[in-house]
Amino acid sequence: SIQTSFPVSMELFTSYREIATDQSKAGKVMRTILMRLGSEVYEQICLAAASADEDRGTAIYYVLHRAFWGGRCEKRVMEALADPYVSRVAKLALCVKREYHHYFGFVRFREISGRFLLAKIQPGNDILSLMALHFSNRFPNENWVIYDEKRQKALCHEKGKECVMRKGVRIQVPGSTVGDMGEYEELWQ
């Protein structure tokens, strides 16, 4: 199976290989999916990839294998819901889509020292990057941070600029104001 994180408990007679992400190859795969399968299939794959399900990688792999098998480009691959992998990817994508739409209405920002807005969330799925466009359009003239406490990731927006994702971040706000703003200012750099 294809896992996106190292397993908590290892199995006997199984070999594990860690494969680093190659951004160049990832970009080529993205463009190929968009050009040959279309934006609807691409969106479903991206949504499923944001799922917290451990087997999402395997399901996505088999859907893409089916779509490109034998040199063909099956643009309607996501309509083959009788296929267990296609069905799984469709269900994962729907679950992720519902969750991030839910968060569009329920993310609450609080002002920190009059300098930026902060919202903390704990979504079940990894939806932070999916929220970037919505909130940057909604608050284009604000400095804001949406912090995923579960994954220790922050989506940072500086007034008039593009969103930036920061990983491995810990944000703690004990009161309504923060004395040392240095740690927060580093998020935008």
Named regions from a protein language model:
Residues 1-189:
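Extended, well-folded catalytic/binding cores that form a central cleft or groove in large enzyme
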